[in-house]
Amino acid sequence: MVKVNYFVKENKIERVEILGHSEFADYGQDIVCASISSIVITTVNACLKLDEKSIKHVQNEGVIITVLKHSKEIDTLINNMIDLLTELSKDYKENIKIGGGNCV
């Protein structure tokens, strides 16, 4: 299962952690994993295109995104990413779980 946790400070998402494997299907056929990857990569690329110093992202066993500079655009992109992942989790409850709103 993929676990998405996000951390909020002063009503703004400060950090997002995405860890685990969806285990929906075999490697190369996993539509849940592909969806998650597309959502996250698109968001990271859009943030960096707007302002290369807006976020820091680290990819190892999972992905950790830290917002370094808040702006209306960056916050909208990060919130949209969480919204999209939340919608995906409604259809694939066994494969992705969203936990968040934890204060930093």
Task: Identify the function of each model-found stretch.
Residues 36-37:
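Gly/Ser/Thr-rich active-site loops/lids in small-molecule metabolic enzymes
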Residues 1-32, 41, 45-104:
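N-terminal intrinsically disordered, cationic/polar leader segments
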